[in-house]
């Protein structure tokens, strides 16, 4: 099984790199504000029609544009969900959502989290899924990419105060990157058997004579952007373990590739935009190393399984609980790491049923800030925060002013970096503590002991880091949990974006300093190791005590 696991990981990464490199070149053109071939005339018509000027924005104007779009989207989505029963395309006549659930869901999809405290097929109409959730899947993904575009321009420009035009960036990202790639993926899903219709649910009679109602809907179109935009919210409650969302091994592979496609392509785009492809490759190597190690650990833990299974008379200790037989333990383990390394949150197996160590790794990947590939845009700007921290630490060790890509890193940048890195750990630890201190928080736990605490810690980690996956043993659809997680999702998203944009505004006005003999090379193996160490050190120091109370204690309770 070790050979199968190695081949699965190697083939996945190889296909990913082949697909990501050309997409990275296209993204680099958008970063440089150069229209893609053949669309310049279309863009001019769009700018005139939409009233978008060529005026570039400083970091405050750029941030204000993004916040305005997202807050407006939040309000519209809340209204769509709350008044769902009065809106069209609701063949099952599903009622509107409660205020707390509508708020939680609206915040969830606007922040690219896609945490779902409801069952899609029994709660949401087709109109809510299409006009509400799918639209936000595009816009939240475009927002993350726009932020990293602004940060990359801050490194590549000098002696200016502008970072581009947010409205032009959002339109270009949506029309020329997200929409065409999502369309290709959706057509592939339809060919593989994923439904795409507006039919009412279909009553059928099973082979045993039982009556069953099969849910229908525009699944393929939402599934495509759900994966490509690292959104993760499923059309159905079972998410990508549902045969209507993920019917075959091919769709399973395509979904994993779609999750990592843009995050990997952005690394290539960063190298091209910086004028040194080695810079992008260094980040890609660092991400890939952590990713491969995590996949290996989860695969090993799930193959070793639970010794209690053998004691109960099972043929094997391999942990197949909560996994689809059409995927198996290795593909399910790979999917779990992919979806939590990126801020996707889609699942093709139940993470709550993983072994203690197998479930701890996805949880830890979220807790370190979703920087191992990460979400579209958010993964790269999160990793660049760790890059700034790493060069600052290196500067302290060698007694030089830290700099990256020729830009000196001063006190202001380090304050904003520290703030951005500390936002999500504070939300996770304080939110988990609050949940464990209150009856409303503890009453949602369906399991006692360390595993029950792990469910709480996983939920808050997922919300604060905008992932959206869950240990399903937590009954989270209550006013307390809906409001707590909505707060964590909102602050975890925009509490990081704001300091990132402030860093971009500070760096873009600085002059690029020529490299000297004392300049730290940020593209070699030494720096890659330093960067990995920084990520691991921050994650370890912050979350080891909490993990020790949950998955670690659960692991050592086994014989």
Curated annotation (Swiss-Prot):
InterPro entries in UniProt: KdpA
Topological category with respect to the lipid bilayer: Multi-pass membrane protein
One Gene Ontology molecular-function label: P-type potassium transmembrane transporter activity
Keyword Transmembrane in record: yes
Subcellular location: Cell inner membrane
One term under GO cellular component: plasma membrane
Alphabetical UniProt keywords: Cell inner membrane, Cell membrane, Ion transport, Membrane, Potassium, Potassium transport, Transmembrane, Transmembrane helix, Transport
One Pfam family named in its UniProt record: KdpA
Transmembrane spans: 5-25, 27-47, 63-83, 132-152, 170-190, 253-273, 283-303, 327-347, 356-376, 379-399, 416-436, 484-504, 524-544
NCBIfam families documented for this protein: kdpA
UniProt-listed HAMAP family: KdpA (MF_00275)
Task of the protein: Part of the high-affinity ATP-driven potassium transport (or Kdp) system, which catalyzes the hydrolysis of ATP coupled with the electrogenic transport of potassium into the cytoplasm. This subunit binds the periplasmic potassium ions and delivers the ions to the membrane domain of KdpB through an intramembrane tunnel.
Family: Belongs to the KdpA family.
Subunit structure: The system is composed of three essential subunits: KdpA, KdpB and KdpC.
The protein's name in its UniProt record: Potassium-transporting ATPase potassium-binding subunit
Organism annotation: Salmonella dublin (strain CT_02021853)
């Amino acid at each position: 099984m070790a050979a199968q696991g190695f081949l699965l990981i190697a083939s996945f990464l190889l296909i990913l790199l082949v697909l990501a490199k050309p997409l990275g070149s296209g993204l680099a053109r958008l970063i440089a504000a150069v229209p893609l071939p053949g669309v310049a005339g279309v863009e001019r018509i769009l700018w005139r029609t939409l009233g978008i000027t060529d005026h570039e924005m400083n970091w405050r104007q750029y941030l204000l544009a993004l916040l305005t779009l997202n807050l407006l989207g939040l309000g519209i989505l809340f209204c769509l969900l709350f008044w769902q029963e009065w809106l069209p395309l609701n063949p099952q006549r599903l009622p509107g959502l409660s205020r707390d659930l509508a708020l939680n869901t609206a915040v969830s999809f606007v922040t690219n989290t896609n945490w779902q405290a409801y069952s899609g097929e029994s709660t949401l109409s087709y109109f809510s899924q299409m006009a509400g959730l799918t639209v936000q899947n595009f816009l939240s993904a475009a927002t993350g990419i726009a932020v990293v575009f602004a940060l990359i321009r801050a490194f590549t420009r000098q002696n200016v105060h502008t970072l581009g035009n947010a409205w032009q960036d959002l339109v270009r990202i949506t029309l020329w990157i997200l929409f065409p790639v999502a369309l290709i993926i959706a057509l592939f899903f339809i060919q593989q058997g994923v439904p795409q219709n507006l039919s009412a649910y279909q009553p059928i009679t099973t082979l045993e004579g039982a009556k069953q109602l099969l849910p229908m809907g525009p699944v393929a179109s939402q599934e495509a952007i759900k994966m490509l935009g690292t959104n993760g919210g499923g059309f159905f409650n079972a998410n990508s373990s549902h045969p209507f969302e993920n019917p075959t091994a091919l769709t399973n592979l395509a979904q994993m590739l779609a999750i990592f496609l843009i995050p990997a392509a952005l690394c290539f785009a960063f190298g091209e935009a910086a004028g040194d492809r080695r810079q992008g490759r260094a980040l890609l190597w660092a991400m890939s190393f952590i990713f491969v190690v995590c996949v290996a650990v989860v695969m090993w833990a799930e193959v070793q399984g639970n010794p209690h299974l053998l004691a109960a008379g099972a043929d094997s200790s391999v942990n197949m609980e909560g996994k689809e037989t059409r995927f198996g333990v290795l593909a399910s383990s790979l999917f779990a790491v992919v979806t939590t390394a990126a801020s996707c949150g889609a699942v093709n197996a139940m993470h709550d049923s993983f072994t203690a160590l197998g479930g701890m790794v996805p949880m830890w990947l979220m807790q370190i800030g979703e920087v191992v590939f990460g979400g579209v845009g958010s993964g790269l700007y999160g990793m660049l925060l760790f890059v700034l921290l790493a060069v600052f630490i290196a500067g302290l060790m060698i007694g030089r002013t830290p700099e990256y890509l020729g830009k000196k890193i001063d006190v202001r940048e380090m304050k904003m970096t520290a703030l951005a890195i500390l936002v999500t750990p504070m939300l996770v630890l304080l939110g988990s503590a609050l949940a464990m201190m209150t009856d409303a928080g503890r009453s949602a736990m369906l399991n006692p002991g360390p595993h029950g605490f792990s469910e709480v810690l996983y939920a808050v980690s997922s919300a604060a880091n905008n992932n959206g996956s869950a240990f399903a043993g937590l009954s989270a659809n209550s006013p307390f949990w809906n409001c707590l997680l909505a707060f964590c999702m909102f602050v975890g998203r925009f509490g990081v974006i704001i300091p990132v944009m402030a860093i971009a505004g500070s760096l873009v006005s600085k002059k690029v300093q020529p490299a000297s003999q004392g300049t730290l090379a940020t593209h070699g193996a030494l720096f890659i190791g330093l960067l990995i160490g920084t990520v691991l050190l921050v994650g370890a120091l912050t979350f080891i005590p909490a993990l020790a109370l949950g998955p670690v204690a659960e692991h050592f309770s086994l014989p």
